[in-house]
Amino acid sequence: MNSQDLKKRQEKIRNFSIIAHIDHGKSTLADRILEKTETVSSREMQAQLLDSMDLERERGITIKLNAIELNYTARDGETYIFHLIDTPGHVDFTYEVSRSLAACEGAILVVDAAQGIEAQTLANVYLALDNDLEILPVINKIDLPAADPERVCHEVEDVIGLDASEAVLASAKAGIGIEEILEQIVEKVPAPTGDVDAPLQALIFDSVYDAYRGVILQVRIVNGIVKPGDKIQMMSNGKTFDVTEVGIFTPKAVGRDFLATGDVGYVAASIKTVADTRVGDTVTLANNPAKEALHGYKQMNPMVFAGIYPIESNKYNDLREALEKLQLNDASLQFEPETSQALGFGFRCGFLGLLHMDVIQERLEREFNIDLIMTAPSVVYHVHTTDEDMIEVSNPSEFPDPTRVAFIEEPYVKAQIMVPQEFVGAVMELSQRKRGDFVTMDYIDDNRVNVIYQIPLAEIVFDFFDKLKSSTRGYASFDYDMSEYRRSQLVKMDILLNGDKVDALSFIVHKEFAYERGKIIVEKLKKIIPRQQFEVPIQAAIGQKIVARSDIKALRKNVLAKCYGGDVSRKRKLLEKQKAGKKRMKAIGSVEVPQEAFLSVLSMDDDAKK
């Protein structure tokens, strides 16, 4: 095709994504669009078609983004090329959303006609506005008995400030309004800008590892054209590769002769190592490079850290390989090797949130068959020492000695909670119990309230979300952004078994709750750790000070069983001998700590504040 034809083709391209809160019907809408445009035959059709991971289908959530090309013949008789980029809706996967939005010109905002706007909807809309996208509101599930499309349209106008007069009323499940949505995409979403004759600039928004072809890049072509045989160059590190294949997804990969400006597809170039490609990097041609890289998206910083250790120590290298493969298309997962006296060799991993941590753990166990021990999650603290240094600490066992600490700052988040009016009291009580500071409260409509609190991230990573759902019968929706670091009265609590510190059980706690939590955890460990041949003291300590203690009584063999009557001094001699043996055993004996003990540090929060 010459450049005139390519420019004409470019005018027919529409790149869009679907943004919505969990369960508002995003994946179902994507399924209907695929059916309507006959991208997928009815024989291949299955629910949640784009959620290809087992985990996504089971949990009913979208974790990874997906990009698909569809052809749609509009009412004006022209055939348009649509690129649908499916995005996740959960707060932990916001970076996936921002990546997919960077590859689009428009976004379909799906709002449930019964539930209305939720916290996560708002967060994603702001991301779309940051990327200057054309937003098309769709009120979904209008066939539900509880649907109230008028109220929801008012919410869209009042809360988000979008004009909802032309919002499409649809039901993805029943297939109502799908054609209207497709027509609006044609009319309202702008065609991609960019110059086919300019040097190649392609944004990498995802990558997948293929055992035979190496790393396969998913790209959005912003300027220029790429075809097999070209020599491409990564702009961040200057490495070059020969393109072996380019193509699109329909959802299956289909090879093409070229990818031109505005296209969204894949590039295979025998890239062997994961480290050579970074999501957000710009690809250009080695012989005619672009002058500057594209404005990528900001690197997401992990908010939650935890240690991951293989239960069988010989699986350490397998775990490293598995993490590297996951990191390939999950740019926000970070890890570095660490050792623990209690757990051996493992990795300290950084995650965006608890769901992200959960998903990574499940993927490691399922896809790579590795049995893991996870330590309690912690956040990044700023520890200011007496010699005026500031250390960032994400692992409690790396905390400096208390005598060297001047003060500690912890991260606070701005939590936005949307909840029906009757549960406002429960939400405020929970937030205050989690050391939250009230900021403001707005009424969205007669019944729903938007409550904003500043809460320490450390309190949120434990079980804030579960507690919030249970105290509001599942009606609350929740979203948070990093806010600032603040001074807090924090201390490090160590757990000692038989006088030895167990590094993997250490945790950071607010001074106010230290005694309570120490007491709860030693009692929990007493129940979990099996009895030994000798007595085992369990102690909770802050620095040198023991704040709680509990003893596991020794198992005792009855050495007097074979003495029928007889001299008391004979019995005493046997008992003394047993006592000396126990003493020697206690001095050299080590205590096996079961997996549940590490998890009990996580769940102690339940009891600490009842």
From Swiss-Prot:
A single GO BP: positive regulation of translation
InterPro entries in alphabetical order: EF-4, EFG_II, EFG_III/V, EFG_V-like, EFTu-like_2, G_TR_CS, LepA_C_sf, LepA_CTD
UniProt-annotated binding residues for GTP: D23, H24, G25, K26, S27, T28, N140, K141, I142, D143
Pfam family, one: EFG_III
Intracellular or extracellular location(s): Cell membrane
Leading EC class: hydrolase
Record membrane topology: Peripheral membrane protein
Keyword presence, Transmembrane helix: no
PROSITE patterns: G_TR_1, G_TR_2
Reaction(s) the record says it catalyses: GTP + H2O = GDP + phosphate + H(+)
Annotated Gene3D superfamilies: 3.30.70.240, Elongation factor 4, C-terminal domain, Elongation Factor G (Translational Gtpase), domain 3, P-loop containing nucleotide triphosphate hydrolases, Translation factors
Keywords per UniProt: Cell membrane, GTP-binding, Hydrolase, Membrane, Nucleotide-binding, Protein biosynthesis
Domain tr-type G: 11-193
UniProt GO molecular function: GTP binding; GTPase activity; ribosome binding; translation elongation factor activity
Enzyme Commission number: 3.6.5.n1
GO cellular component term of the entry, any: plasma membrane
Family per record: Belongs to the TRAFAC class translation factor GTPase superfamily. Classic translation factor GTPase family. LepA subfamily.
Function: Required for accurate and efficient protein synthesis under certain stress conditions. May act as a fidelity factor of the translation reaction, by catalyzing a one-codon backward translocation of tRNAs on improperly translocated ribosomes. Back-translocation proceeds from a post-translocation (POST) complex to a pre-translocation (PRE) complex, thus giving elongation factor G a second chance to translocate the tRNAs correctly. Binds to ribosomes in a GTP-dependent manner.
Protein known as: Elongation factor 4
Organism: Streptococcus pyogenes serotype M3 (strain ATCC BAA-595 / MGAS315)
Lineage, highest ranks first: Bacteria, Bacillati, Bacillota, Bacilli, Lactobacillales
